[in-house]
Amino acid sequence: MVDNRTVEQRLAAVAASMTMAGYTMTKADREESRRILRGEVSADESVRQVLADAGRDAADLVGKTAFRRLSELESSRPLTVFTRETLLATHAYLCGDVYPWAGTIRTSEVGAMGLAMCRAAYVDQELDRLFRRIEQSPPSATDREAALNTVAEHWGELTIIHPFLDGNSRTQRYFFDHMLRHAGWSLDWRRIAAAEVHAARYVAAATLDSSLLVDALRPGLSTGEDCPQLPTEPAAVLFHRMMEFRRAHPHESFHKLFFADKQSDKLRQPARDNQNG
C-alpha cells in the first residue's frame, strides 16, 4: 500500500504537468488521480469511463485522459533512459487515447507564449542534436546546482523545439523530472509553482537564459528554511514579468530580487495604512 505522503507528492507532480498544459484539475480529478496512485483502479479502466462520455469536448477529453495516464506513470517504475525514443513513447502513452498522431513529430508550424517555435522542417535534426547533448551532458549526481542548470538548459532547448502539436508540457515535465530523479535528486512539486516553471521554460527558449528556470525549480530541492515565497500569477503574466526583469537585472535572481521586493512592499503597507489612518 502506498503511503499518503507519497501519494500526495506524486499527485502534485501530476497536477503540475496539467497546470503547464492549461488544465486545472478539479477536486474530483484529484480524487481519481489518488485512486490510480494508490492502485485502487487502473488507468485503463478509468480512461475507458471517460471515453464513454461522448459529450465531452476534445480539450476536456485530452485533459481528463492525460492526468489519468500521468498518475499511472508516476506510480510505475521510474523512467531511466532519456532518448528521443523514450520521449516519443511517453508522449504516445499520455496523448494516444485522444490523438491518433500521438508520439509522432509535428509537420506543421506552431507557436506559444507569442513565440514562434522551431520550424517544422528542422524539428527532426534539432531533436537529434539535443539528444546528443543530453547523452553527453547528464545531470550531476553530486552537485545540486549543476544538476539543475543542466536540466534547465536541456528543458529550455526542448521547449523551443516543441516536437509535438500538443502535449509538450505534460511530456516534458515528466521527462525532466525523472531525469533528475535518475541522477539521484527528487523534485517535490508541492513546493514549486508550476506556472512559474512553465513561464521560465519559455524565457529559456526565447533567450537561452535558463537561470530563471533554475530559480523556479530550486525550491523543490531546498530545505523548508530556504524555500522562497512562490509566485501565484498565471504563466503568461509571469513570462512577461520575467522578460522585463531579465532586461532590467541581467544575471540576477528573479526570486531573490523580484519576490524580495514584493515582500518589502507588503511589509511597508501597514506603515502606509497607519499614516493614512
Model-assigned labels for residue ranges:
Residues 1-277:
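FIC/Doc superfamily catalytic core
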